[in-house]
Design a protein with these regions (language model features):
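Phosphate-group recognition and catalysis centered on beta-loop-alpha active-site segments
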Residues: 1-261
């Protein structure tokens, strides 16, 4: 939700257009633009040689990743940050194993041969060709305070990402989000002109995802937590542009507070 525009709704492509085409591939983003969807969310990690790349998970996902011989990978612990970009190019992420849990979820996703994990620079170059005034790019920086050696430091990640953003001249079209608010603190301190969105997850019964919202949480960059549903006040105090909560955490009270702020 964009706090300053309570009646504002925008249609986004999530990880490109993963319902129809392989997620986070250049072809998926091209497909969005061809269908007049001019806003998207995507994910950024860093390769071993410090190149920002477009991929969601810290590790290669066996459900849609094949090796250079065309076989599904079986190793679930191939860390993106352990591989150079040239090594990442050996993998094909253009098809979906329909027997996997992910594959059963997106049964209509088409296969595209020889799809590689793109660089952030490639995606921004593609996006710069979209002259729509409604272009909006949500870059989620994937970072975690809970596990070391999956990424550079938050400051290093932010500088690497912003180097590419500044080259693109798309600064006014970009909002940067993260569950790891340490990265957003770095953006605030180093690049205050860039819009920031704060991702959150509040524990729900029966869902095995770690809660990121609690007093002095490392996910929240150790900011004090006011009250359970007053995240908008915390974000406003940081000069943030938006709250991006887990969809099942959205309540009327949360929306009302957001609009008041």
């Amino acid at each position: 939700m964009i706090l300053s525009k309570p009646n504002y709704i925008k249609i986004y492509g999530h990880r490109g257009a993963r319902g129809d085409l392989p997620e986070n591939t250049l072809e998926s983003f091209k497909y969005l633009f061809k269908n007049n969807i001019n806003a998207y969310e995507t994910d950024i990690l860093i390769s071993k040689d410090l190149i920002p790349v477009i991929t969601h998970d810290f590790r290669l996902d066996p459900s849609f990743t094949k090796d250079n011989e065309g076989n599904w990978i079986t190793d679930e612990n191939i860390i993106i940050f352990d591989l150079s970009y040239d090594e990442l190019l050996k993998f094909d992420v253009g098809s979906l194993n329909k027997l996997s849990r992910y594959g059963r979820r997106f049964v209509n996703q088409k296969t595209l041969e020889n799809q590689k994990i793109p660089k952030l620079s490639e995606l921004l170059e593609l996006s710069s060709k979209n002259k729509s005034e409604n272009l909006l790019i949500n870059l989620e920086i994937k970072s975690t305070p809970d596990e070391e050696n999956l990424t550079p430091t938050p400051e290093e990640m932010v500088k690497l990402v912003m180097k590419e953003v500044n080259k693109s001249n798309l600064q006014n079209k970009i909002i940067i989000s993260s569950f790891d608010w340490r990265t957003l603190t770095e953006i605030k301190n180093l690049y205050p002109e860039i819009s920031r969105a704060y991702l959150s997850f509040q524990q729900q019964a029966g869902i095995k995802i770690k809660n990121t919202i609690y007093n002095r949480s490392p996910w929240m960059s150790y900011l004090p937590f006011f009250e359970k549903y007053e995240l908008p006040k915390i974000i406003k105090s940081q000069g943030g542009k938006a709250l991006h909560p887990y969809h099942k955490d959205i309540t009327k009270k949360l929306v009302d507070i957001s609009h008041q702020e």
